[in-house]
Design a protein with these regions (language model features):
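Small/polar-rich, solvent-exposed N-terminal microdomains that initiate assembly or binding
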Residues: 1-54, 98-110
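Residues at secondary-structure transition points
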Residues: 2, 51-55, 78, 82, ...
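Intrinsically disordered, low-complexity coil segments
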Residues: 29, 69-83, 124-132
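Intrinsically disordered, low-complexity acidic/polar segments
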Residues: 48, 73-75, 149
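Oligomerization/assembly interface segments of phage tail-like spikes and tubes
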Residues: 56-74, 91, 134-146
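Mid-chain, well-packed structural core segment of small domains
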Residues: 76-103
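Acidic-leaning, charged glycine-interspersed low-complexity segments
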Residues: 95-147
Length: 149
């Protein structure tokens, strides 16, 4: 059986290091960052193993919400739609980008005892902001197909 927590930790660490933006797991990350990601562990599908194999595959879905908030130094400011679109592009590159020459993933996902078999964009609802709100956000959901290594 594949434990979900190590996968979540690995995805958050990868997105943080590759984007140079803080990532909060289900809540705003510590600190006072104006631009950050929220990572949510959503639904998952479990595929039954063949008769000779006791290990199940797992296909979890993770939601990445790119957030751009108001500038604390500027009263009445708001988040920047261009910033969240850049962040969404970066998240897409981190999880789905491939090297054009080799076809290998640009950013490997390393989880002990787990092999990543596939990655895909599950759904991308896009911007979820209210013009009257100072916070701008953009939502994407990624599916990862995992098998025990």
């Amino acid at each position: 059986m594949i434990a979900r927590r190590p996968v979540t930790i690995a995805l958050a660490a990868l997105l943080t290091s590759a984007s140079n933006r803080p990532v909060g797991r289900g809540k705003k990350p510590p600190g006072n960052s104006q631009h950050y990601y929220l990572l949510y562990s959503l639904d998952a599908a479990v595929a039954g193993p063949p008769l000779a194999d006791e290990n199940e595959d797992l296909s979890p879905v993770y939601q990445v919400t790119s957030v751009s908030g108001p500038d604390p130094a500027r009263p009445n400011s708001s988040g920047d739609p261009d910033q969240v679109e850049w962040m969404a592009d970066k998240a897409r590159e981190v999880f789905l980008g491939r090297h054009p020459g080799t076809g290998l993933w640009l950013h490997p996902i390393i989880v002990t005892g787990v092999k990543v078999m596939g990655r895909s964009l599950d759904v991308e609802p896009g911007g979820t902001n209210d013009p009257a709100d100072g916070i701008i956000s953009y939502v994407q959901r990624f599916r990862f197909d995992l098998t025990p290594a």
